[in-house]
Amino acid sequence: MSVHIGAQEGQIAETVLLPGDPLRAKYIAETFLEDVELYNEVRGMYGFTGTYKGKRISVQGTGMGVPSMSIYVNELIMSYGAKNLIRVGTAGGIQEDVKVRDVVIAMSASSEMGQNRVRFNGMDYAPTATFDLLHRAYMNAEKAGIPVKVGQIFTADQFYQDDFHHFKKWADFGCLAIEMEAAGLYTLAAKHKVNALTILTISDHLLTGEETTSEERQSTFDEMIRVALDTAVEVTN
């Protein structure tokens, strides 16, 4: 057991999907996995292990934001030996050609995250996805006929910003979407020499105001999940 995850040794697979919402973790496990075992419900942050296409896969809720996500990622890696970490989450679109419900694969993540400012003594670090995971995810989406966009995103520290124009600068420099975890995930993966990828569904749009419901965010977005799972089985022993 670790501080925030109540699993025993061997209960968590080497490849873990990471939704922020613990209820999305439950949905993924119940909808897509077979032989499912609940290994964690500490603080209501559900974690499950099951099989998908014959391979053991885990899914662990992380909560919102880099600080919460970092707790679970550190423990998954250091206490349970996770090797492949795939975030499946939602984001806000900030480009006109990125529509609500589109799937976005995050090649890299700019950020305003305070953790890296402290970690790198004020210098800038460029957190990026593991290319092997990114390439496999893109090819799996192509094979399944699921249109995806690949590019840079922005990881925000605040969900509610004082100034919307703060995001316009990132859009001007090509960021596709805004979310709250990817830069932290990619940084920790690099530190611990494991693999990481972020696959997102656009749940709302900062330019048009279009948005999905909380129920839809919790229990749909199946295209993103299928791409993540098909990628997971390819890198799982």
Curated annotation (Swiss-Prot):
The active site is at 204 (proton donor). Phosphate binds at residues 20, 24, 43, 87-90. The lineage of its organism: Bacteria, Bacillati, Bacillota, Bacilli, Bacillales. One of its GO terms (cellular component) is cytosol. InterPro entries: DeoD-type, Nucleoside_phosphorylase_CS, Nucleoside_phosphorylase_d, Nucleoside_phosphorylase_sf. Keywords: Glycosyltransferase, Transferase. GO terms for molecular function: purine-nucleoside phosphorylase activity. It comes from Exiguobacterium sp. (strain ATCC BAA-1283 / AT1b). GO terms for biological process: purine nucleoside catabolic process. The record marks 217 as: Important for catalytic activity. Homohexamer; trimer of homodimers. This is Purine nucleoside phosphorylase DeoD-type. It catalyses: a purine D-ribonucleoside + phosphate = a purine nucleobase + alpha-D-ribose 1-phosphate; a purine 2'-deoxy-D-ribonucleoside + phosphate = a purine nucleobase + 2-deoxy-alpha-D-ribose 1-phosphate. Its EC number is 2.4.2.1. Catalyzes the reversible phosphorolytic breakdown of the N-glycosidic bond in the beta-(deoxy)ribonucleoside molecules, with the formation of the corresponding free purine bases and pentose-1-phosphate. A purine D-ribonucleoside binds at residues 4, 179-181, 203-204. Belongs to the PNP/UDP phosphorylase family. Pfam families: PNP_UDP_1 (PF01048).
